[in-house]
């Protein structure tokens, strides 16, 4: 199966200079916990999650009013193209201990996101359980 068969499209993005308050508001309004961070040309330079905000800013007593996305984002973007196989997504999640992979078009711009839940639609229950366990046991923050 190809990524394009499972990808959640219409991905929202945010710029690295956006405020943390702006990100939090967007996440709350859209009921999402993950946003690709893009440069002025729309290409991904990182990702930010609600957990990144908590761990990298709030837990460290950071100034939330003045904080910017680039202070909390993960800079190493895991991405695939829509025409790639879902096995690559599963392998990326396992290798990097992540639960979401960005889907980018041929020009490198975000077009969607594949989550661990999306993998559940593809894999048999036993395999999903093993993949989820591996990802959750090894979840780490990387920059």
Where do the model's predicted regions map?
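The conserved cystathionine-beta-synthase
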Residues: 13-31, 38, 80-97, 103-105, ...
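A glycine-centered beta-loop-beta connector
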Residues: 27-30, 35-51, 93, 101-117
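Tandem CBS (Bateman) regulatory domains
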Residues: 1-10, 49-79, 85-94, 113-143
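Short acidic/polar alpha-helix capping motifs at helix-coil junctions
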Residues: 1-3, 17-20, 32-36, 52-56
């Amino acid at each position: 199966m190809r990524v394009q068969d499972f990808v959640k499209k219409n991905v929202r993005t945010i710029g690295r200079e956006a405020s943390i308050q702006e990100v939090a508001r967007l996440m709350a309004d859209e009921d999402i916990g993950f946003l690709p961070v893009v440069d002025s040309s729309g290409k991904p330079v990182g990702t930010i999650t609600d957990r990144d905000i908590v761990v990298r800013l709030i837990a460290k007593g950071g100034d939330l009013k003045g904080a910017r996305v680039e202070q909390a984002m993960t800079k190493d973007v895991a991405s695939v193209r829509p025409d790639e196989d879902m096995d690559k997504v599963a392998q990326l999640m396992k290798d990097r201990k992540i639960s979401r992979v960005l889907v980018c078009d041929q020009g490198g711009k975000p077009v969607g996101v594949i989550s661990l839940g999306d993998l559940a639609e593809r894999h048999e229950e036993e395999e999903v359980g093993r993949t989820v366990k591996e990802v959750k046991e090894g979840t780490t923050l990387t920059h």
